[in-house]
């Protein structure tokens, strides 16, 4: 290595390269790590140095050299690279390694208009000094490399045009806590700030992108998931498009229910016009969804819902595929096809399904969600009425078309609307669930808007976070974590702004939360159980019972303190009904695990004090926040022991937690022989989860004759999911023979919106 090389410092002056200094920094970063070599990193970076290189480029070269060495055999390079990256990041943010005092930092950033003025108005200087004592900046050193790159790319407050970064991670965690608990009484709030800071900065509670990036800044917009329902009128269609644009611009992911729109050829105004059908309006919604690109990265994303018995269903099912022409395809949205028991029964019996336009069959569309018996009665009555326009198809043909499109696009999703309403926290007579969201984990009531300022409409919003199961040693720890998670998200509802009245009204009256889990695959590996063989069933039952029990208890305690939510009377909880009463009894064949908590006294307390929140749980995908916490994604099995994720911040390698000790315990996605074990586990989770679960189905064609997945396997899995009470199915993944570890991080969930 040429020791006389000249380098350019941050202030523009030149000096001779100082190899000792570089050696000291790498040695510092390698301290306490196993199986990493300082000289390897030096060697790989030295060959890339050149005359006049900037010191910041030297730093980035060293970081990259360390990151390139991350592998199964030496996973600790992910921490060496991370420490070097943290060092670099702090130099960029503060000019030196040690962060400033908290109060000075906040004052400076409020003055620069990067932080919210409320931070200084709500807390005194003494309180800031106390909070400074809560911060442990060394926690930065527990991040993996992928986490630091995600923080830099998505979460830290920065100027996205110039690339300047203004803060480091521990300030982010503390200021999110301080913002959320700012309206709590002075006597208790610092205690909550400290405990929530500790829970989030040690990765026990995981927060979604909008909260991590936005809380503490002047922009108060953190809705993760937005559900918008459309009626069968031009005014409502326009109001829906307008609401979509407003929310897409705020980085939210959208669920659209367009199932009520009448079919092609229906009469308009008593026959003076001929209706153009659904497709032109779906195109209109697609244009609205793609109209705003978020931070110049990409357009928004939406999933659009309709019932399988819609007269146009055969044309709607193919909207996403690559055949056809522009006129009859709407490819840039995903679709959720709505099913219920009657449709499955027709399939099993080998009989027929009749397709109608919702406009021709009064009461049928409403009953599809609110009352299954009434739906069947009306459906059969309309089938026999010769005056009603209809089309009859073999059930197996339309189900096969549905599953064929799901297989070829991967993104035709399933919603079982009867399960969404019979095993629901909402009373379907007054607040039926008629759709889900972008990623299929939300099940909340909606009402169509007739115009954009319609106060009688209802746009559903859901606020998310998750427990990191890998960090939980004992299920009783969930009691405190549940209390913190519920209090923080509930406070967020009052802290944020709402761009559309129909969303504000319902969000504040229902106060729906969706708290999920990450790191489930590590949790199973750590406990020595597997997805595929039933060994995880009892553990999963115990775990999700504890989660739902402690969350309900936390929400009940908060209701005691701050009052029940305004629409509590629209929930089944108000009638004394709990998830343990309405679950699908077929699950009892999968696990005989008894209930371990005192549900009966909780039932009494809920009837006496109410709940602060209508819903508490939803199991969402979690690509981004899993990287921050160095966890496995949501409830999914990992594709490989090392995952390589491509994102706009480059290629990020991440090794599964505790790889050296647990490598044989992890069950990798494509080693799992069928979907049964996974679907059984999701069913057990759904027994307790009050909203829905982003559950995927996975197929490796090589396991089947001729390398093709047989239709009967696809249909069997669909029926298994229904049998065990699954409300929704999300992606269908087909193994394509490419390297399994490669995943694309931006897979359509807008701004990480409905994921966390």
Curated annotation (Swiss-Prot):
It is an enzyme of class 1 (oxidoreductase). The active site is at 437 (proton acceptor), 439 (cysteine radical intermediate), 441 (proton acceptor). GDP binds at residues 209, 437, 441, 623-625. Under complex allosteric control mediated by deoxynucleoside triphosphates and ATP binding to separate specificity and activation sites on the alpha subunit. The type of nucleotide bound at the specificity site determines substrate preference. It seems probable that ATP makes the enzyme reduce CDP and UDP, dGTP favors ADP reduction and dTTP favors GDP reduction. Stimulated by ATP and inhibited by dATP binding to the activity site. Its EC number is 1.17.4.1. Pfam families: ATP-cone, Ribonuc_red_lgC, Ribonuc_red_lgN. Keywords: Allosteric enzyme, ATP-binding, Deoxyribonucleotide synthesis, Disulfide bond, Nucleotide-binding, Oxidoreductase. ATP binds at residues 9, 15-21, 55, 91. Tetramer of two alpha and two beta subunits. NCBIfam families: NrdE_NrdA, PRK09103.1. This is Ribonucleoside-diphosphate reductase subunit alpha. It comes from Haemophilus influenzae (strain ATCC 51907 / DSM 11121 / KW20 / Rd). The lineage of its organism: Bacteria, Pseudomonadati, Pseudomonadota, Gammaproteobacteria, Pasteurellales.
């Amino acid at each position: 290595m040429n020791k006389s090389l000249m380098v350019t410092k941050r202030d523009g002056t030149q000096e001779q390269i100082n190899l000792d200094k570089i050696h000291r920094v790498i040695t510092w970063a390698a301290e306490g790590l196993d199986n990493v070599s300082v000289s390897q990193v030096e060697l790989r970076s030295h060959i890339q140095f050149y005359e006049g290189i900037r010191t910041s480029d030297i730093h980035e070269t060293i970081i990259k050299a360390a990151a390139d060495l991350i592998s199964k055999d030496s996973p600790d390079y992910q921490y060496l690279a991370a420490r070097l990256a943290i060092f670099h990041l702090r130099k960029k943010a503060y000019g030196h390694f040690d962060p400033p005092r908290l109060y000075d930092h906040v004052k400076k950033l409020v003055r620069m208009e990067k932080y919210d003025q409320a931070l200084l108005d709500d807390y005194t200087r003494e309180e800031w000094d106390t909070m400074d004592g809560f911060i442990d900046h060394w926690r930065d050193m527990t991040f993996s490399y992928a986490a630091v790159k995600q923080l830099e790319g998505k979460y830290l407050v920065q100027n996205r045009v110039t690339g300047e970064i203004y803060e480091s991670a521990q300030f982010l965690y503390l200021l999110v806590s301080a913002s959320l608990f700012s309206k709590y009484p002075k006597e208790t709030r610092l205690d909550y700030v400290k405990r929530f800071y500790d829970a989030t900065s040690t990765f026990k509670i995981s927060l979604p992108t909008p909260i991590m990036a936005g809380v503490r800044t002047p922009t108060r917009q953190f809705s993760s998931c937005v559900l918008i329902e459309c009626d069968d009128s031009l005014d409502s269609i326009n109001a829906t498009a307008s609401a979509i644009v407003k929310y897409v611009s705020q980085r939210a992911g959208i669920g659209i229910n367009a199932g009520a729109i009448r079919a092609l050829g229906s009469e308009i105004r008593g026959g003076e016009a001929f209706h153009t059908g659904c497709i032109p309006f779906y195109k209109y919604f697609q244009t609205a969804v793609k109209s705003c690109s978020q931070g110049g990265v990409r357009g928004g994303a939406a999933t659009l819902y309709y019932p399988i018995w819609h007269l146009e269903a055969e044309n709607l099912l193919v909207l996403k595929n690559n055949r056809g022409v522009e006129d009859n395809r709407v490819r840039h949205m995903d679709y959720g096809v709505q099913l219920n028991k009657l449709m499955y029964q027709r399939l099993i019996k080998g009989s027929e399904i009749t397709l109608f336009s919702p406009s021709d069959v009064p009461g049928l569309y409403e009953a599809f969600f609110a009352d299954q018996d009434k739906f069947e009665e009306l459906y059969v009555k309309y089938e026999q009425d010769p005056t009603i326009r209809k089309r009859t198809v073999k059930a197996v043909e339309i189900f096969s078309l549905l599953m064929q499109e799901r297989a070829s696009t991967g993104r035709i999703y399933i919603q079982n609307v009867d399960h969404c309403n019979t095993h629901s926290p909402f009373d379907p007579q007054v607040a039926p669930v008629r759709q889900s969201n972008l990623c299929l984990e939300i099940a909340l009531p909606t009402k169509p808007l007739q115009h954009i300022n319609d106060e009688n409409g209802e746009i559903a919003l859901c606020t998310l976070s998750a427990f990191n199961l890998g960090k939980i040693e004992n299920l009783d720890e969930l009691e405190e974590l549940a209390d913190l998670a519920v209090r923080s998200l509930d406070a967020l509802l009052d802290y944020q702004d709402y761009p559309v009245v129909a969303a504000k009204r319902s969000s504040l009256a229902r106060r729906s939360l969706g708290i999920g889990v990450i790191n489930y695959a590590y949790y199973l590996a750590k406990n020595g159980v597997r997805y595929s063989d039933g060994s995880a069933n009892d553990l999963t039952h115990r775990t999700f019972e504890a989660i739902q029990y402690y969350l309900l208890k936390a929400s009940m305690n908060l209701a005691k303190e701050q009052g029940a939510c305004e629409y509590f009377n629209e929930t089944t909880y108000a009638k004394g009904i709990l998830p343990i009463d309405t679950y699908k009894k077929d699950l009892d064949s999968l696990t005989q695990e008894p209930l371990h908590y005192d549900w009966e006294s909780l039932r009494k307390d809920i009837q006496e004090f109410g709940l602060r929140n209508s819903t508490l749980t939803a199991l969402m995908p979690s690509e981004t926040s899993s990287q921050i916490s160095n966890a496995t994604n949501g409830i999914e099995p990992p594709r490989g022991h090392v995952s390589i994720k491509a994102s706009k911040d480059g290629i990020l390698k991440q090794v599964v937690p505790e790889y050296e000790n647990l490598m044989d315990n992890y069950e990798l996605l494509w080693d799992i022989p069928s979907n049964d074990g996974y679907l059984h586990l999701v069913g057990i989770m759904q027994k307790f989860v009050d909203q829905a679960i982003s559950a995927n189905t996975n197929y490796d064609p090589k396991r089947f004759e001729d390398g093709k997945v047989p239709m009967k396997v696809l249909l069997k899995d669909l029926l298994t999911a229904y049998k065990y009470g699954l409300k929704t199915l999300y992606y269908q993944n087909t193994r394509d023979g490419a390297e399994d570890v490669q995943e694309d991080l931006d897979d359509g969930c807008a701004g990480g919106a409905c994921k966390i």
